[in-house]
């Protein structure tokens, strides 16, 4: 067995890598639910979004969707860590999981992400379901 095959096998079976992959998957589901919820609200006010490309441009550049950027950036950071060939450490995974826990805390009295997240949870059942899934994932032991 080649060295790269052994490294791949270690990466695939690492409990830390598996935990981070599961959390990433949950975050992507939450991110999608939030985008759909925001799209529906945006369209009620400004009219129909004509294409996926237009939606992508709005998500990246329109102030309406700016509050989602911390979640997008966290997914990118997890992707970069998972793509790195080195062995993950408990500390770096713990830091990322703490960031995820801190980010997905809705607050009626908060501002920025916390407040917008709270509002999305109030109006979109899909966001509630994705939030519950994330809470389950984050309550599982990492090792």
Where are these regions (language model features)?
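Surface-exposed peri-terminal alpha-helical interaction modules
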Residues: 2-143
């Amino acid at each position: 067995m080649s060295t790269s095959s052994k490294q791949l096998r270690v990466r695939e079976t690492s409990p830390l890598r598996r935990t981070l992959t599961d959390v990433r998957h949950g975050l992507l589901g939450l991110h999608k639910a939030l985008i759909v919820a925001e799209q529906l609200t945006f369209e009620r006010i400004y009219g129909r979004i004509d294409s996926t490309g237009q939606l992508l441009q709005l998500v990246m550049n329109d102030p309406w969707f700016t509050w989602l950027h911390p979640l997008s950036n966290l997914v990118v950071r997890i992707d970069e860590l998972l793509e790195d060939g080195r062995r993950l450490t408990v500390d770096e995974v713990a830091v990322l999981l703490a960031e995820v826990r801190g980010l997905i805390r809705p607050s009626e009295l908060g501002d920025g992400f916390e407040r917008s997240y709270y509002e999305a949870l109030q109006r979109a059942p899909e966001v509630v379901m994705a939030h519950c899934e994330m809470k389950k994932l984050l309550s599982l032991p990492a090792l």
